[in-house]
C-alpha cells in the first residue's frame, strides 16, 4: 500500500466480499495513520453535494465533485449481487473503483464501484456502495471472516399501477410478495404471497433494492419490524432474519450439509451440490450429490465461505463423492 507521501507499507488481506468488490486490509505500521470516519448513508439526501476520490487513469488522488442523483439504485443489468447503490454525477472513470465518496462534513458515505457508460468512460452517472453496507461488511470480515447476510425470505416485485389492477389492491407503492420461502423468517412470522411490504423498521420500501439495501446492514438473528398491507388493511409483524443456506458458484447450486450428512460422512464442514449446470465439471465426473469440501486449500464450512471466495484467484476445489472418495480439480 502506497500513501500520498509515497511511503510504502506491507498489508495483510483480512477478508474480501466479491459481491460488492470490497476487501479489508490490515496495514503494518508503527505510526498512526490518518483515517476517514464513517458517515450515515441512510440520512444522505438526493441533491446533497459529494466528492469522489480516486486514481483515474493513474492520476493519483484525483477529487471530483457532484451531487447525489438517486439512492437505492438497482443495476440489474450488471453482474452484481449488491443491488442498492448511491447514484451521483461526480466524474468517475477507470481507476476510481475503490475510492471514497465523501460528504461535505468529510465523512465516508460510499465506496465508488461502477459507472454507467457505453464507451467505458464517464458520461454523467456513477455508483457507490453505501457506507452503511460498507461498514457492516468491514465489521463482518474482521469478526467472522465472511459477510453475515440476514435474509427475510421473500421474492416479488415493486408494486405499480398494472400490478395493483391485476391483484385488485388500492395502492401503487410497496413491495408485492410473490413467494415466501419455506423455513425462512418471513414464513415463520406469517407473511403470505400477495402481502405488500410498506416499511422495514422505519425505512420505506418501494423497490427490491430498497429492501435488499436495508437488509444488507443486518445480520442473521436480528429482528426487524415489517409493516405490510393485506386485503387493504395495514399490519405490523416482527420477523427474525435467517442465514442463507444456498448459493451459486461455477454453475453449481450449493446448500449446507445437514447433521445426518455430517454424521454419515464423518464431516465437520462442506456444502452439497443440489444442481449442476457446469458441463466442464460434469465432464470431470462431478455431479449432483457431491460435497464440496475445500476451495484453494481452505475448508468450506458453509455457503457463506463459498460467497467469500475470490473467483479470479481460484486454483483448486476438493470434492467428496457419494462413495466416500475425494477428488481434487485443478484450475490453471
Enumerate the predicted regions with their spans.
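Short, surface-exposed beta-strand/loop "edge" segments at domain boundaries and coil↔beta transitions
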Residues: 280-283, 324-329
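Conserved PDZ fold ligand-binding element
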Residues: 186-207, 273, 280-304
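C-terminal structural cap/anchor segments
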Residues: 236, 241, 245-276, 281-282, ...
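Edge beta-strands of extracellular beta-sandwich domains
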Residues: 237-240, 327-332
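Serine-dependent protease modules
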Residues: 1-189, 199-223, 229-248, 255-260, ...
